[in-house]
Design a protein with these regions (language model features):
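Short beta-strand segments
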Residues: 149-153
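Nucleotide-activated sugar donor-binding and catalytic core shared by glycosyltransferases
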Residues: 1-147, 157-277
Length: 277
């Protein structure tokens, strides 16, 4: 496709010694075919390599292509054993974005419900569950007048649906995603989905969080595993069917949780392994 052509043209013009590919098994294969002398580092999720909930043949396909890399860096909430198909293999904690590394959280009465995770090219079930989380937070805000409930929408259509609802005065609707460092710095509580990157950032910063497990059955299993693997007191799971009263009680409880030991990011280990390649 056009993007593939563009990438290969950039490689020919720039002639790099090393290329880092975030997943994308077919791109790894294509680069190794067309540019065999260039070293390739694959950044992977633990579930990309070991996932008993996925089809075995699909996992064999993905691992066959991922293992063409000169170095596979598997970063996430859990560590996994080396797969013998890989040349060089490193399993580390999640690599944290540079803009998050320097954030210092000073808790306030601000609660942030971050409706991220993408709303483009996703199923209706995902959109519906996203709206349901936002609507729940709108209802809960009236039960928690001492807090300000920020609801951060990842798209205009989600914002439009929520904006039609009546909300208490302590609700602030954001019609687009705001920089994470902007709300991480003063959040007393974050309400989010159970994705690897967001949970890892919250664990690194020590911010209390309520994480919703939602979406298709495959995603629910993956998100539940993320919570279980993390296993820290500052982050708990919730389901979409929780009542507003129970959710308000949970919010108040989590606002009182003390910070634990931060989860160390895998950034330094990843950089060292690449430099030694």
């Amino acid at each position: 496709n056009k993007m593939g052509i563009y990438i290969h043209n950039c490689i020919r013009e720039f002639t790099p010694d090393l290329i880092v590919v975030d997943g994308e098994p077919l791109m790894i294969k294509s680069i190794k075919i067309s540019h065999p002398s260039i070293k390739v580092v694959a950044l992977l999720n633990p579930a990309d390599v070991v996932n008993p909930n996925n089809n075995k043949e699909a996992m064999d396909f993905f691992n066959e292509f991922y293992s063409l890399s000169d170095l596979a860096i598997v970063h996430g909430i859990r560590r996994i054993d080396k797969d013998s198909r890989y040349t060089k293999f490193l399993s580390i904690n999640t690599i944290i974005r540079s803009e998050i590394i320097g954030v210092e959280n000073v808790p306030t009465n601000n609660i942030y419900c971050v409706l991220g995770g993408g709303t483009v090219n996703v199923g209706q079930l995902f959109v519906d569950s996203t709206i349901a989380i936002g609507q729940l937070c709108q209802k809960v805000a009236s039960l928690l007048p001492q807090y300000t409930m920020h609801i951060v929408c990842s798209s205009q259509n989600i914002f439009n649906v929520l904006n039609r609802n009546s909300s208490s005065e302590n609700v602030v609707l954001h019609d687009e995603i705001i920089p994470a460092e902007q709300y991480y710095c003063n959040a007393g509580l974050v309400i989010t989905r159970s994705g690897r990157n967001t949970l890892s950032e919250l664990a690194y910063l020590g911010i209390p969080a309520i994480s919703f497990v939602s979406g298709c059955s495959y995603r629910k299993i993956e998100q539940t595993n993320n919570i279980n693997d993390l296993n820290i007191s500052t982050i708990v799971a919730a389901n979409n069917d929780i009542s507003p009263v129970a959710f308000a009680d949970l919010c108040q409880k989590m606002m009182q949780v003390k910070k634990g030991e931060p989860m160390l990011p895998g950034n330094d280990e990843a950089i060292k392994s690449i430099l030694h390649l």
